[in-house]
Amino acid sequence: MAAAELSSDTPLAPVARVVSARSQLAVQRLITQSFRRLGWGVADQAVSSLTNVAVSIYVVHSLGAAQFGAFSLAYVTYGFALNASRGLSTDPLMVRFSAVPVRAWRRGVRRATGTAFTVGLATGIATLAAVTLLGGTAGAAFLGLGLTLPLLMLQDSWRFSFFAAGRGGHAFLNDSIWGATLLPALVLLRMTGHANVFWFTFAWGATAGIAAVAGILQAGVLPRPAYTWDWLVKHRDLGTRYLLEGTLSSAVMQVRGYGTALILGLAAVGYVQASVTLVGPMTILSLGMGLVTLPEAARILRRSPRQFPVFCCLVSAGLSLAGLAWGIVLLVGVPRGIGHAVLGSADVWRPTYPLVIPQTIYVVGGGIAAGAGTGLHAMGAARRSLRAAIIGALIAASCSLVGAVVWGIEGTIYGLAVGVWVGAAINWFEFRKAWQEAKRARAVTHKQPGAAADSAQGER
C-alpha cells in the first residue's frame, strides 16, 4: 500500500512516512551523485577540448596549411584507431563494469587497458607500414603517429576506466597532465627549430605516454596485454559490434579526409580541419560525453529504470542545443579579427568561415543521435546500434564524396551532416524498439521472482 493511501490515524502511517522520506532522500542522493559525476565529465571534456583546440591553433600557426593538412590526416587516423580501441576494450568495460565492486572493477580495468595497449600496438605497426607508401609530409606525420599509438590508446583507456568507477576527478587530472605537458613540448620544439609535422605529431603521442603512466599510478592497476585474447573472447558479443560501429564512424572520416585531399587538394583538408577547430569544443563535447553518459545511463537503468528514457532524451537535448548555441555564437558573435588571430591569417579564415554553418548542422545532428546511442549501448543492444551506424555511415561517406565533387569544400561537410541526421533518426527508432523489448523482459522477470533471484545470484 502506498504512503499516500494511508490515513493519518492508521497504525502503519508513521512507518509509511519514514519509508517515503527515505525513498526521497535516496532519490535526492542519486540525483546529486549523478550531477557530480556529470560535472566532472564536463570539466574533463573542457580540458580535452581546450587542449585539442589549442594544439590545432598552434600547429596551424607554426606549420601552415599543407603541413597542417598532413597533421589532420594523422589525427583522423588516430580517431580510427581510437574507435577500434574503445569498441574492443573500454566500451564493454563501461557497460559491464560500471557500479560494480572495486575488486571486479580492478579485474576488468586490468584487462581492458591491456587490450587498449595491444590495439594501439597493432594499429601503430599498420601505420608505420603505410609510411613507406605515403612518403613526404604525410609520411612524416604518420611516422610520428605510428611510434606513439600504443601510448595514445592507453591514455584514452584510463579516462573510460575512471568514469566507469565514478572517479571523474581522476580522469580530469589525467587529461590535465597530458595538456600541461603537451603544450610546453610544442613550444619547446618551435623554439629549438624543430617545428615540423613529425616532431609535433611525435610530441603529441609521447606526452600522452606521460599521462598514461600517471593513470597507472592513479588507479594502482597495471595493464595486462597478455589477457587481451581472454577479454576479447569474454566480451565478443559487445566488442565485435562496437568495433564495427566505431570503425565505420572512423572510416567515414577517413574517406572524407582522403577523398577531400584527392579531389580538392591537401590544403582543403586543412581548411576543413580549421572549421572543426572553430566548432571544436562542441564537437568534442558531443562525441566525447559518452565517457560520462554511458556509465551514468547504465547506473540509472539498474537503479531507476523509469528515468532511463528521460535521461537519454536530456542527453540529446543538452548536446544538440549546446552545439546550436555555439554555432550561432561563431556566426554572429565572433569578429573577423578574432577569427584571423585564431587561425593565423585571413588566407585561412576566409575559406573556413563559410564552413561553420554545415559544421554546426553536423554537430547538432550528432547531439540528437547521442542520447539514443547512449541508451542502446547501456542496454547492450549492440546489434541495433550497429544497424543504425552502418546505414548512417554509408549515406555519410557517399554524400560527402559527391558533395566534394559538386559543391567543393562545403559540400563534403553537408554530406556528412546528411548522414548523421539520418543516423540520428534510425538511432531513436532502434532505441524505441530496444526499450520496448527491455520493458517486456523486465515484466516477465518480475512475474518470476525465483528466476529473478537466480539471475541476481548468478550475476554476483
Listing of model-derived features with the role each one plays in the protein:
Residues 5, 14-21, 29-87, 240-267, ...:
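Signature of the first transmembrane helix
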Residues 18-30, 34, 169-174, 193-201, ...:
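Interhelical loop/hinge segments that connect adjacent transmembrane helices in multipass membrane
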Residues 34-35, 97, 101-118, 236, ...:
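Interfacial transmembrane-helix starts/ends
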Residues 36-53, 177-182, 200-219, 223, ...:
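Transmembrane helical elements of multi-pass membrane transporters/channels
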Residues 52, 83-102, 275, 279-305, ...:
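Helix-loop junctions and terminal segments of transmembrane helices
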Residues 131-145, 332-364, 410:
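Interfacial segments at transmembrane-helix termini and the short loops linking adjacent helices
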Residues 143-146, 172-221, 391-395, 409-434:
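Hydrophobic alpha-helical transmembrane segments
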Residues 151-173, 361-390:
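Membrane-interface junctions at transmembrane-helix termini in multi-pass inner-membrane proteins
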